Amino acid sequence: MNTATCFIVLLVVATVIGGIEAGESDMRKDVMGLFRRVICTGADSPCAACCPCCPGTSCKAESNGVSYCRKDEP
């Protein structure tokens, strides 16, 4: 193989590897989003100091003194 052919092959391999890595980084973002959703406190659950309420909910105190994550009013 001559120099031009080697250069083209190297360019194609680099493009393929770059595409694979880009796909993996998107996958990592999805997995991290899933992980964040798992560790948040869902609606109608007691508020926890270690885990914030999930998006769309907020911590509200009840008459019994316990705070619960409740859905936000629109």
From Swiss-Prot:
Compartments reported by the entry: Secreted
GO molecular function, one term: toxin activity
Tissue specificity remark: Expressed by the venom gland.
Superkingdom, natural source: Eukaryota
TM region positions: none
Keyword hit for Signal: yes
Domain commentary: The presence of a 'disulfide through disulfide knot' structurally defines this protein as a knottin.
Stated name of the protein: Lambda-hexatoxin-Hv1d
Species assigned in the record: Hadronyche versuta (Blue mountains funnel-web spider)
Upper taxonomic lineage: Eukaryota, Metazoa, Ecdysozoa, Arthropoda, Chelicerata
